[in-house]
Amino acid sequence: MRVVLLGPPGAGKGTQAQKLSEKLGIPQISTGELFRSNIENGTKLGLEAKRYLDAGDLVPAELTNQLVDDRLSEPDAANGFILDGFPRSLQQAKALHEMLERRGTDIDAVLEFRVSQDELLARLKARGRADDTDEVILNRMKVYRDETAPLLDYYRDQLKTVDAVGTLDEVFARALCALGK
């Protein structure tokens, strides 16, 4: 099963991706983790990404796409994966489609984790990160909405909405149900 998780910062995508990965026996692929592991391992792409990150710049989409494409080529992803944090834009969604088309496959499901803005604010403030001021959090939510709205339409045929308010187990049960598991 090939699954994309969408949702704003604080919706619990990473936590649910980990639980789904364990339950379904397929890898969780997080762009943040791809950056970290490639940088730690000193790969060519990792070193290139590090240059951007060290300068405080965003890593170009083409570089992120290449990291994801390389990761999807690994044997453990042959029978499925859970993408957490990718795609973030329509351009990346189209690039992902091309990556999978070359492999003769496609996305099976897209789960959108939905949480109210008030709940997200409360969750993100509770994390206690120094940079999580109301202004920063609200801006991250706006960026998410602006970038993700086109993705919801792009994936409309595979899209399932999951109410992400509740205990971890309640949200997990809803996610499994949305996947038909």
Swiss-Prot record:
Gene Ontology biological-process entries: AMP salvage
InterPro entries: Adenylat/UMP-CMP_kin, Adenylat_kinase_CS, P-loop_NTPase
Record's protein name: Adenylate kinase
Protein's organism: Mycolicibacterium paratuberculosis (strain ATCC BAA-968 / K-10)
Similarity annotation: Belongs to the adenylate kinase family.
Classification via Gene3D superfamilies: P-loop containing nucleotide triphosphate hydrolases
Pathway assigned to this chain's UniProt record: Purine metabolism; AMP biosynthesis via salvage pathway; AMP from ADP: step 1/1
Keyword Disulfide bond: no
Name of the gene this protein is made from: adk
Subunit structure: Monomer.
Catalytic activity: AMP + ATP = 2 ADP
Places the protein is found: Cytoplasm
Location of the region described as NMP in the Swiss-Prot/TrEMBL record: 30-59
Keyword ATP-binding on entry: yes
